Amino acid sequence: MVKKVVMATIACAASGIGFVPAVHAQSSVTLWGLLDAGVSYISNTGGHSAWRLDDGIALPNLLGFRGTEDLGGDTRAVFQLVTQFSLQGNLVAQTSNGSGTGTGLFARNAWVGLDNTQYGKLTLGRQYDFMVDTLFSDVGADMAMYGGGFYGFRDGPFAKLGIPDSPPNEAFDFDRMNGDTPLNNSVKYTSPLLGGFRFGGMYAFGGSAGNFQQNSAQSFGASYSLGSFAFGAAYTDVRYASLLGDSIRNYGLGAKYRGDKLLLTALFTSTRNTQNGAVVNAAEAGALYQFTPTISASLAYTYMWGNGAVDRNHAHQFGSVAKYNLSKRTAVYVQSEYQLTNAGANAAINGTFGPSTGRSQFIGRVGMQTVF
């Protein structure tokens, strides 16, 4: 039941594959989308509490086009174009391996390639790395996937981690699993499923004059599934121009158990800035239970800790979501997130875009989501 009600609805947020019926044709183009909106209360952002109508939290607001063409010999031409937007009518900026952010029409994903049943898939363009593809989409090891969403990804009192293009005073989505940081100019290979095993690798060209490696990136991932269990590992290294030859390195390990009504997840990620030596680790455990076909609830706990370069700050974060499915495509939900840091550090839940002036920060939210 968990697989039917939760996985089919939420997994598309990172993978970019919409919740639509399969199209059995030699050539097809599918339009799909995700929408989320709600009201959130933030206990402390910049010293003040706040109420706000925000969107793209439990799911990002996405509109995508997916196309396939049968070329014969078990080979297909494939493409995907995805844009992210707010319900206020604005495109959402996406960071990348280049300097600054992108607000182009298809800044979330834009790629084309070939997919062969026997040999795998080769794609070129602006794409997710394997922190997203393997740990989030393939294994499903991140509880943010099942309801925590934007507020459930990792952030905290780690501004000294120094990730380029991150919002001021934050280490926004430092382990890259939110999907907001696709890689430009990338070539990616993903193997077919081989006895439960899948692997892949990608390289993103920098292309800066006089410095081939500047703004380049590389990523690798592997996963294995066996019955109700799935496991995965991923690594991504991005050489941002502003780091002057150094990089942000991420790696992660994840696991998931999926039963009839119970789903359990475990995730570990580590992020290093090779320029200043800063390291932040995160360990998360989560559980979701499907009480009825329409009612589910999830809990998540995350512990994040840094080394001396980030003042050895650490943070505990607790998240919960209760969801009621109005249909197979539409749901309403209640969400809470609470973060508590060590003394002298300011809490910063991902997506608040303004840390607390104290050790704690709380978010309560009521929202609605739909997919098409």
Describe the role of every protein-language-model region.
Residues 19-25:
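Sec/Tat signal peptide C-region and signal peptidase I cleavage site
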Residues 26-41, 51-206, 223-227:
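Outer membrane beta-barrel
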Residues 29-37, 73, 77-81, 122, ...:
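Transmembrane beta-strands of outer-membrane beta-barrel proteins
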Residues 42-46, 88-92, 133-136, 210-213, ...:
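Outer-membrane beta-barrel proteins
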Residues 48-51, 96-98, 174, 206-207, ...:
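Extracellular loop and loop/strand-boundary signature of outer-membrane beta-barrel proteins
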Residues 62-64, 109-111, 186-188, 219, ...:
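Membrane-embedded beta-strand positions in outer-membrane beta-barrel channels/transporters
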Residues 213, 217-325, 335-338:
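Detector for outer-membrane/organellar transmembrane beta-barrel domains
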Residues 326, 359-372:
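Outer-membrane beta-barrel "beta-signal"
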